[in-house]
Amino acid sequence: MLAAGRRVACAVSGGVDSAVAALLLRRRGYQVTGVFMKNWDPLDEQGACSVDRDCEDAYRVCQKLDIPFHQVSYVKEYWNEVFSDLLKEYELGRTPNPDIVCNKHIKFNHFLHYAMDNLGADAIATGHYARTSLEDEEVFQQKHTKRPRELFRNRFEVRNTVKLLQGADLFKDQTFFLSQISQDALRKTIFPLGDLTKSFVRKIASEHGLHHVLKKKEACTTFPFQSMGVCFIGERNFEKFLLEYLEPQPGNFVSIEDKKVMGTHKGWFLYTIGQRARLAGLQGAWFVVDKDVSTGDIFVAPSTDHPALFRDLLRTNRVHWIAEEPPAELVRDKMMECHFRFRHQMALVPCVLTLNQDGSVWVTLVKPARALTPGQFAVFYKGDECLGSGKILRLGPSVFTMQQGRNREEGTKKEDIDKVEPAT
């Protein structure tokens, strides 16, 4: 059997998905090594999240499967390449997505090279619900380049692009979180769960006695306004956690409709667009629709579907394309139709991309989307292929702003008509 000599380093987190991924690889005959990545030091703060408990669960999985277990620390790398970036983004008034950044820098860079260079692995594997255009055996035929890489890849080297494809379980599909990983990493990665549903994965775990991981929650915690799965926050209040690292920046809640001050807040970085703003003494729900970092004002509106929450235009930074280059259609025509999302599990939205000279894109949506948020990633799709992503840096005017402009324009026209002297 070809698989017998193939060595695979499988990331194990102590959860059910990575456990079943390792199990399936073992059943296929690969020489599997489980690797637990420690990305956060609980001694750094007064946290409630137990990294040690996750490590113990991962170790028990490897014992159960009779595979070697390794633990590697990326605490320093995570701080420098993920968490520091997260803090800077919040200071700029944006809402970052550390999961995407972590996958790019830690799991599919540092872990990949550790597995290849230190463990002698031929490939890595994770428990993500995603697929690639390579068959598993083709992964082992891909060349691995040891670090440091050459500054420029040999342009005469002929390589067929490996595609990142959505998982069979579209509800659990995690290509969104993989949209910034490199082509080189994708070539050396196996996703054993790509063709499976979550319910079937849990069934496999149960049938093979992995009961301790079945009892665990999906993630240690999530942010209050969207699922990010930042495990090191634990059961703590997100506001208190962030204020451990950022100085309070008090400001006002301001009504987007009449610019009236509605209350005060401790810092614009504690709120994201679309989040409910709890305003003392006011009836009804108010929602964050915009932020002005220069003044510290957070603009709010009195309903969850207020037109100030909806926009149909955004601009990204330089897009990371999974194929390393923009799609040929986009290069040729400078425009391309595709689909996009900026939150995991949100419905894909038809859009048109316009390519800029700096590699960024304007994204024009066929209909306005709610709570487009600077700092989040716009992830692009063609069919079941994830093309890549770019960080949202700028937003077009909201539907509310456009309505106000039209109202002013119509009012001006009416005034002009009134000024015209009647014909005699």
From Swiss-Prot:
GO terms for molecular function: ATP binding; tRNA binding; tRNA-5-taurinomethyluridine 2-sulfurtransferase. GO terms for biological process: tRNA wobble position uridine thiolation. Residues 97-99 are annotated as: Interaction with target base in tRNA. Its main location: mitochondrion. It catalyses: 5-taurinomethyluridine(34) in tRNA + S-sulfanyl-L-cysteinyl-[protein] + AH2 + ATP = 5-taurinomethyl-2-thiouridine(34) in tRNA + L-cysteinyl-[protein] + A + AMP + diphosphate + H(+). Catalyzes the 2-thiolation of uridine at the wobble position (U34) of mitochondrial tRNA(Lys), tRNA(Glu) and tRNA(Gln). Required for the formation of 5-taurinomethyl-2-thiouridine (tm5s2U) of mitochondrial tRNA(Lys), tRNA(Glu), and tRNA(Gln) at the wobble position. ATP is required to activate the C2 atom of the wobble base. This is Mitochondrial tRNA-specific 2-thiouridylase 1. The lineage of its organism: Eukaryota, Metazoa, Chordata, Craniata, Vertebrata.
